[in-house]
Each structure stands twice: as structure tokens, then as C-alpha cells.
């Protein structure tokens, strides 16, 4: 039993007396070379290699200098990239702006552009593409400027034909070559402001609508008919002749001025033509309320009672005088 277990252990785990055979046998020639050491032929070849190394260094330096000379000679034939931004197509005066926004970029052959080495063929292809794009951009801008000029017309351009004029806010709007203030909305066949969903402010400004606008037009027409410059001028001349143009701003004259205007003083001719009126006779006031005048103070009662007696005495005196003269 023990022998079988030992054999199983050797098979599974290996024997303790055996050594691992990891080394490989070297070739016979290599072993012989190690035993013999370096020969004379190897020494000579190594010496020749050492002599050739400085020559190779000199050749590499010569090649580097020749490459620099060639690059210097080829610098005259460097590729130039002309990148034109072109005029702005959104501007009206883009057609007159010269193509001055050009950026010239010189790229030498073998230069590192964008992390890649630029070769001669690649640079040539890139130049051709840029020139094609510039030509297309110039053509598009020219077409856009011509279209703008045709659309705007000569009225909205200045003398140079490049910039548009501003909007005249004082000019009255026209509709079919007629002023809008003379058009009655009822005459129009189409009334888009009556359509559902229409914005009335797109057709009437300042808060007007169809009815208030018609009322405004009728009122303006009435004012034009009533306005008569000649009549206003004649009224001003009349006021100037009467001296009323120098009145105060309030329009109210002082009391003496009003009296002088309403009651002018008569001249000499007026005095001759108009005689003074005779004075009214003094008739006694009739007695009221039992012989007493209303609201009469007591002191005034005695003279009124004496007035008939005085008249009687005067009449008697006159009669006596006449009798004496007759005698």
C-alpha cells in the first residue's frame, strides 16, 4: 500500500530527488565559439565597422546641409493660400466694396498644418478648393446685390445707388395713387379688416376704426369748407381800424374803455344838430296811503304840505301887481 501511495505522490507532485530540467542545450557551434574565444576574422570586421561609423556621421551631416540648401531654394516656390471672406451679402452696398478682406497664408511644403504634414500635392488641392469657394461666393454676392437693386428701384437709392433713403413720416400715404384721407372706406370693394381674426391696428392707426375714421374725414371736410382766409383777414382789418387789436389777452376791457366805446362823446356838429331837451315840469306827487307817501321820513312832510299855500300866495301877489300897473 505504501508503495502505491508513493507512486501516486510522485506522479502528482513529483519526486524530491529529481531536478528540474529547464535548461536547453545550446547549439554545438555556439558552444565551440564560446570555448575557442574571438577569432582574428571577427576582430578585423569589427575594426572595419568602427572605421565606417564616422563616415556615416559625416554623410548624414552632409545630407542635412544639402536638405537645408534645397529647402532654402524651394522657399521661392512656396504655396500661397488666398482666403477671401468676400463682401457681406446682407449689406446693400456689398457690390461696391472691393475685395480687400483677403488673408494670404504661406504654407511651405512639409509644414505641419493641423497636426498633419502638408505635402505639395495636398497644398495644391487645398489651394484649388479655396479658389473655387471664393469664386462661388463672389458670384452669389454679385447676384444678391443685383437682385436688391432691381427690387428697390431707383427711387429708394441715393445718387450712388448703394443706400436707401429714410421713410418720410410727414408724407401722406397713397392707395392706388390717391391720398388715403380722400378715400371713403365704404367705397372699397375689399374690406380685409372685417375678416375674422384680422388685427384692426394693421389698417387704422391711432386707435381709429372704420366708423371713427369716417367721422374724422367728414369733420375735416367740414372744416375745410368753413375755413375762409379772406373772411378772416377782413375781420382782422376791421378790428385793427376800431383799435380792438390792442386789447388785453383776456379779452376784457376796463370800465372807462367800455364806456368810451359804448357812449362816445358828441362832437360840435352833433351838438348843433341835436338840441337839448326841455326839463320836465315839476308836478306834485299824488298822495298815497291817506295823503302820505310810502317810506317818507317825517321831516319831508311839512314842505310838501306848504307847497300849495306858496303857490296861492304867489298868484295873489301877481294879481296885485297887475292891478297896480293898470291903475
From Swiss-Prot:
InterPro entries linked to this entry: Fip1_dom (IPR007854), Pre-mRNA_3'-end_processing_reg (IPR051187)
Annotated stretches, region: Disordered? 1-102, 136-167, 245-280, 301-327
Renumbered to this chain, the Acidic residues biased-composition regions fall at 66-79
Where it mainly occurs, coarsely classed, is: nucleus
What superkingdom does the record give? Eukaryota
Query: GO biological process: what's one of them?
Result: mRNA processing
Keyword Nucleus part of the UniProt annotation: yes
UniProt-recorded Gene Ontology molecular function terms: protein-macromolecule adaptor activity; RNA binding
What spans are recorded as compositionally biased (Basic and acidic residues)?
18-30, 49-58
| GO cellular component terms given for this protein | mRNA cleavage and polyadenylation specificity factor complex
User: Where does this protein reside within or beyond the cell?
Assistant: Nucleus
The UniProt entry, under Pfam families, shows:
Fip1 (PF05182)
Q: Biased-composition ranges for Polar residues?
A: 154-163, 245-271
Q: Does the keyword Nucleus apply?
A: yes
Q: Which UniProt keywords apply?
A: mRNA processing, Nucleus
Q: Which family does it belong to?
A: Belongs to the FIP1 family.
What this protein is reported to do is described as:
Pre-mRNA polyadenylation factor that directly interacts with poly(A) polymerase.
Q: What is this protein called?
A: Pre-mRNA polyadenylation factor FIP1
